[in-house]
């Protein structure tokens, strides 16, 4: 499951993300954060951390440096 999620995020980074303007307010980007957190915490907890990060990446959040 972990590898499937990472493959999905990599697909997003390579195929879909270049079609949209860069708008992530954090470093590392949300997709890179997702890969790091899934590798570190596993599919469920890492996926939840990535989901929470995506929810926080919006115009009302300051952003900044945020590692998993």
UniProtKB/Swiss-Prot annotation:
Using the UniProt record, give the first listed, main subcellular location.
membrane
Keyword hit for Cell membrane: yes
Query: Does this entry carry the keyword Manganese?
Result: no
**UniProt keyword annotations, A-Z:** Cell inner membrane, Cell membrane, Membrane
Name the domain of life: Bacteria
Q: Which GO terms describe its cellular component?
A: plasma membrane
Membrane topology annotation? Peripheral membrane protein
A Pfam family assignment:
YidD
Q: Where in the cell is it found?
A: Cell inner membrane
The UniProt similarity line reads: Belongs to the UPF0161 family.
| HAMAP family in the cross-refs | UPF0161_YidD (MF_00386)
User: In UniProt terms, what function does this protein have?
Assistant: Could be involved in insertion of integral membrane proteins into the membrane.
Return the NCBIfam families for the record: membrane protein insertion efficiency factor YidD
Name of the protein in question: Putative membrane protein insertion efficiency factor
The uppermost taxa in this organism's lineage are: Bacteria, Pseudomonadati, Aquificota, Aquificia, Aquificales
């Amino acid at each position: 499951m972990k590898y499937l999620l990472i493959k999905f995020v990599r697909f997003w980074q390579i195929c879909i993300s270049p079609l949209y303007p860069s708008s992530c307010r954090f470093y590392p980007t949300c997709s890179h954060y997702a890969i790091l957190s899934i590798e570190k915490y596993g599919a469920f907890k890492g996926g939840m951390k990535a989901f929470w990060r995506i929810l926080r990446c919006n115009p009302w959040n300051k952003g900044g440096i945020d590692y998993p």
